[in-house]
Amino acid sequence: METAQTAPAPGSLSWKLSSHPITLLTFLFFRISSLLVYLLGMRLLSSNFVLIFIVTILLLAMDFYYLKNIAGRRLVGLRWWNEVDGATGDGRWVFESADPESREQNATDKRFFWMALYVQPVLWVVMAVVALFGFNFIWLTLVAIALVLTITNTLAFSRCDKFSQASGFASNAMYGSGLARNLAGGLVSNWFRR
């Protein structure tokens, strides 16, 4: 007796439904690998702290770069960066989002991205508590670096998503009702009446 194999529902947590499976799997690899190296190093190889520290920092840096520049753009259409004004030295964050009309978002990619983005800082906070209560203060330095990197990406992508939704709402409100067309038409006609 054969059973019919049902396909996973769209948006479910199956990498096979991803529009960019290699990007998704690489993203998940970097997200998970730094935590695993830290956990295994802290419990099994604690005598070689320097090696675990270096490998974990390298994995965190690769995760930060890959998430910021590749996974965010390909999986959810969001990107951010920091620009510094050369004259004043002031920095500002710049957020970029793909045009929602020209880019169809995959529900699976979106779900994996946001879940992994928010879960990892929580797991690093748990690691901080474990290191604190275990009196492993030297491991706490590594957790602090991990928290800075993961929280920076989490905050930046959250803001980027918020601004992309706000700009999408504003453009839909203006162009959808013809408000921008009427306003521009009125300004142009007033200009030529003078």
From Swiss-Prot:
Taxonomic superkingdom: Eukaryota
Subcellular location: Golgi apparatus membrane
A biological process term (GO) from this entry: protein secretion
Family under the similarity heading: Belongs to the TVP23 family.
This protein's UniProt keywords: Glycoprotein, Golgi apparatus, Membrane, Transmembrane, Transmembrane helix
Membrane-spanning parts: 22-42, 44-64, 112-134, 138-157
Protein task: Golgi membrane protein involved in vesicular trafficking.
Membrane topology: Multi-pass membrane protein
Glycosylated position list: 106
Name by which UniProt lists this protein: Golgi apparatus membrane protein TVP23
Any one GO CC term of the record: Golgi membrane
